Amino acid sequence: MADEQLNEKDLNVEETGAGNAADTRVLELEEQLAAAKDQALRAVADLQNVRRRAEQDVEKAHKFALEKFSSDLLPVIDSLELALAHSSADDEHVKQIREGVELTLKMFQDTLKRYNLEAVDPHGQPFNPEHHQAMAMQENAEVEPNSVLNVFQKGYLLNGRLLRPAMVVVSKAPSAAQPSINEKA
């Protein structure tokens, strides 16, 4: 009977040892499983981020593919507008040419609008350094300081991105008259 009790104790110790080893192994495997799940989730998230970035890059490429082409066309628009500004609508000799230039300019502008190219003509608006380039400052008491008085050249935006800034003259407050030498004395 003593031998049977010893064998049972040995079996219990072996089972307990085997149970602890199995529990330890189960915990290790659960940790490995959790780590593998975490890696899989990260891989899926990384893949989604790469796809999203690629889609954004393609969208930007489509959106701004016309940037260089549009920049090259802006001097043509400027020339047509300048031709209209320097021709008289009353002169019979250039009336038909002027009408042709007006129609050409209108078709050109309509086409550019279809491709989201919009003019920045800030006459009378507050100066915005993000869209305007100040070419000169001029004193003027009739308008608010830092207002656009004159536009030398229109600016343009392509899909909301600045393609060319508007070149403008900006108002400044009149300076106070300097007292003369006689007034100082």
Curated annotation (Swiss-Prot):
Residues 1-22 are annotated as: Disordered. Transmembrane segments: none annotated. The keyword Nuclease does not apply. GO terms for molecular function: adenyl-nucleotide exchange factor activity; protein homodimerization activity; protein-folding chaperone binding; unfolded protein binding. InterPro entries: GrpE (IPR000740), GrpE_coiled_coil (IPR013805), GrpE_head (IPR009012). One of its GO terms (cellular component) is cytosol. Residues 1-12 have a biased composition (Basic and acidic residues). One of its GO terms (biological process) is protein folding. It comes from the Bacteria. SUPFAM superfamilies: Coiled-coil domain of nucleotide exchange factor GrpE (SSF58014), Head domain of nucleotide exchange factor GrpE (SSF51064). Keywords: Chaperone, Cytoplasm, Stress response. Gene3D superfamilies: 3.90.20.20, Head domain of nucleotide exchange factor GrpE. It is found in: Cytoplasm. Belongs to the GrpE family. Participates actively in the response to hyperosmotic and heat shock by preventing the aggregation of stress-denatured proteins, in association with DnaK and GrpE. It is the nucleotide exchange factor for DnaK and may function as a thermosensor. Unfolded proteins bind initially to DnaJ; upon interaction with the DnaJ-bound protein, DnaK hydrolyzes its bound ATP, resulting in the formation of a stable complex. GrpE releases ADP from DnaK; ATP binding to DnaK triggers the release of the substrate protein, thus completing the reaction cycle. Homodimer. This is Protein GrpE. It comes from Pseudomonas putida (strain ATCC 47054 / DSM 6125 / CFBP 8728 / NCIMB 11950 / KT2440). The lineage of its organism: Bacteria, Pseudomonadati, Pseudomonadota, Gammaproteobacteria, Pseudomonadales. The gene is grpE.
